[in-house]
């Protein structure tokens, strides 16, 4: 038996090609009209929570004079959200390389406000012809159980219901507004636009791309449990649903607690989240020493999601019949996976793998 197939069969994953009534999904229309909306709503209800109502923000921009030795324009873009309860402003930074017509844009949800940042090698990114649109996740809403402040405070009613938005959903909400803004910019209207994030923000990037089909690609770096990694069959040393929910319940909908001791009861697994991105491009990055992020289950999720790309006549995920090893970079399909040496980090190496794979996939080189 195939090595990979054997590993997948052990996990007894819900079948993406079979709907809730037991009918086979054999066409793109059956997927887009029935199964995709069903899974999307299920994942929001049971895992991340429903996104809050749309608010059109007031936007203001200002130019930063220091601009990478003249190689880029650098703007501060502020999003001011107001509703009947309150108002809140989120600062972001947009860096666009000069002289690059229709360059790809990457929305990056970051752990800090500064650019460059240890996770954003900005000059290397613009030298590769990519624009970067960055936001500090704590400037959206704080990474804790406080739902009274930040964007969350505009919607918090005093209690969280079963499908109330967790912090990951709020971070995704902001990223979707950043996409709205880029679509109004002349420099980005005809450009590829992707989203990237690391760890909990890699989870956020995947959710954002799953919900908003305007994203052309998504880079999920070391996103692990409740991101790119399957929840069933958690590998030795990997983070389980119990581990993540008992430490970070505020990331998720309260409904998610039902499954933390029995992930096999989940009516979906994370390959379904990846499948919601089809037929667009997904790039999953893992690090060998980052066992907590469960590299094998991130790899297997890529394999398990691939049949949905095949429905579209796409390549999906292409790899040899083996589990991944250090140095592997499978980027011949629409789903890409690489495993580097090192620890839990968004490195320059990861950025370069993602950028080169995007260039290859979209024939930019």
Predicted regions and their residues:
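N-terminal targeting or regulatory segments adjacent to alpha/beta-hydrolase or S9 domains
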Residues: 1-89, 359-364
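Proline/glycine-enriched tight loop/beta-turn segments at coil->beta junctions
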Residues: 86-90, 96-105, 128
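Cap/lid segment of the alpha/beta-hydrolase catalytic domain
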Residues: 101, 107-185, 224-227, 231-232
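Primarily recognizes the serine-hydrolase "nucleophile elbow" in alpha/beta-hydrolase
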Residues: 115, 119, 176-238, 262
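Mobile cap/lid helix-loop segments that gate and shape the active-site cleft of serine hydrolases
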Residues: 220-273, 298-320
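C-terminal catalytic histidine-bearing segment of alpha/beta-hydrolase fold enzymes
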Residues: 247, 257, 302-365
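Conserved strand-to-loop "acid loop" that flanks and positions the catalytic carboxylate
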Residues: 278-293, 340-341
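Conserved alpha/beta-hydrolase "acid-adjacent" motif
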Residues: 291-301, 347
């Amino acid at each position: 038996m195939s090595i990979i197939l054997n590993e997948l069969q052990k996990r007894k994953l819900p079948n993406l090609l079979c709907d809730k009534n037991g009918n086979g999904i054999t066409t793109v229309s059956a997927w887009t009209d029935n199964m995709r909306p069903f899974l999307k709503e299920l994942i929001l209800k049971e895992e991340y929570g429903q996104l809050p109502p749309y608010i059109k923000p007031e936007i203001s921009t200002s130019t930063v004079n220091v601009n990478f030795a003249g190689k880029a324009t650098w703007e501060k873009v502020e999003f001011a959200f107001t509703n009947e309860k309150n108002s809140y402003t989120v600062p972001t930074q947009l860096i666009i390389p000069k002289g690059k017509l229709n360059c790809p844009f990457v929305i990056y949800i970051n752990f800090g406000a500064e650019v460059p940042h240890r996770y954003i090698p900005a000059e290397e990114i613009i030298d590769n012809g990519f624009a970067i649109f960055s936001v500090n996740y704590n400037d959206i809403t704080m990474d804790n159980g406080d739902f009274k402040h930040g964007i969350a405070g505009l919607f918090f009613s005093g209690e969280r219901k079963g499908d109330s938005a967790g912090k990951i959903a709020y971070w995704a909400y902001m990223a979707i507004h950043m996409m709205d803004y880029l679509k109004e910019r002349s420099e980005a209207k005809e450009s590829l636009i992707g989203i990237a994030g690391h760890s909990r923000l890699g989870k956020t990037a995947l959710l954002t791309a799953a919900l908003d089909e305007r994203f052309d690609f998504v880079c999920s770096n070391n996103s692990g449990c409740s991101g790119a990694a399957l929840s069933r069959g958690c590998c030795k040393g990997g983070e389980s649903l119990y581990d993540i929910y008992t430490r970070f319940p505020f990331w998720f909908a309260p409904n998610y607690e039902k499954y933390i001791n029995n992930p096999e009861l989940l009516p979906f697994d994370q390959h379904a989240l990846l499948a919601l991105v089809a037929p667009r491009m997904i790039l999953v990055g893992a690090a060998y020493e980052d066992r907590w992020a469960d590299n094998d289950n991130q790899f297997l999720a890529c394999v398990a999601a691939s049949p949905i790309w095949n429905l579209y006549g796409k390549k999906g995920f292409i790899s040899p019949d083996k589990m991944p090893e250090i140095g592997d970079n499978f980027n011949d399909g629409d789903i890409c996976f690489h495993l580097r040496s090192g620890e839990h980090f968004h490195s320059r190496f990861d950025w370069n793998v993602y950028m080169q794979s995007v260039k290859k996939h979209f024939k930019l080189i």
